[in-house]
């Protein structure tokens, strides 16, 4: 396996999953590093997506081609409109999701994106040369390097 990437994303929370998917979908050779493949995009003890603030962010992610809204639709167990006692400007959709199905739906999406490698490990060191990040080392002594502008012809 080639351990040189255009983009390396550390952490497979919601933002890390969206970032890795976006980079890979734009054609970048991408590596997503997570400590636990069974906790990709894990939701908190309140597995809600939506509400006034997060609902706006989810709509923006959706407009940019992201996956959080799609995964929410696939794994929701309850949909509700919040703040109905207030005016329409304050109404906000929210979904409660099945936490385990949410993880598996995200994994299925990520594992089927071309250019995206998912690596289970812990990052122990960021490699910096001349003030620039050039890669990282993991707990299992795997080295992942970033392509540099000088090495663009190597691909």
Language-model region placement:
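Beta1/beta-strand and adjacent pyrophosphate-binding region of the FAD-binding site
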Residues: 3-13
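Conserved N-terminal/central alpha/beta ligand/cofactor-binding core
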Residues: 4, 21-132, 140
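Residue-level detector of intrinsically disordered, flexible termini
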Residues: 11, 96, 150-151
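N-terminal Rossmann-fold NAD(P) dinucleotide-binding loop
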Residues: 16
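Core beta-strand elements of the Rossmann-like FAD/NAD(P) dinucleotide-binding domain
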Residues: 142-146
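Single conserved hydrophobic/aromatic residue that forms the stacking wall/gate
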Residues: 147, 151-155
């Amino acid at each position: 396996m080639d351990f040189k990437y255009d983009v390396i994303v550390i952490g497979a929370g919601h933002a890390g999953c969206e970032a890795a998917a976006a980079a890979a979908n734009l054609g970048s050779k991408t590596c997503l590093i997570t400590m636990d493949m069974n906790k990709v995009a894990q939701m908190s003890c309140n597995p809600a997506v939506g509400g006034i603030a997060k609902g706006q962010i989810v709509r923006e992610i959706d407009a940019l081609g992201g996956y959080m809204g799609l995964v929410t639709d696939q794994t929701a167990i309850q949909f509700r409109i919040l703040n109905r006692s207030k005016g329409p400007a304050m109404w906000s959709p929210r979904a409660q999701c099945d936490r385990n199905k949410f993880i598996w739906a995200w994994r299925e999406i990520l594992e089927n994106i071309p250019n995206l490698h998912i690596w289970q490990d812990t990052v122990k060191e960021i490699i910096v040369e001349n003030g620039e990040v050039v890669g990282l080392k993991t707990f299992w002594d795997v080295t992942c390097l970033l392509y540099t502008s000088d090495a663009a012809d190597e691909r």
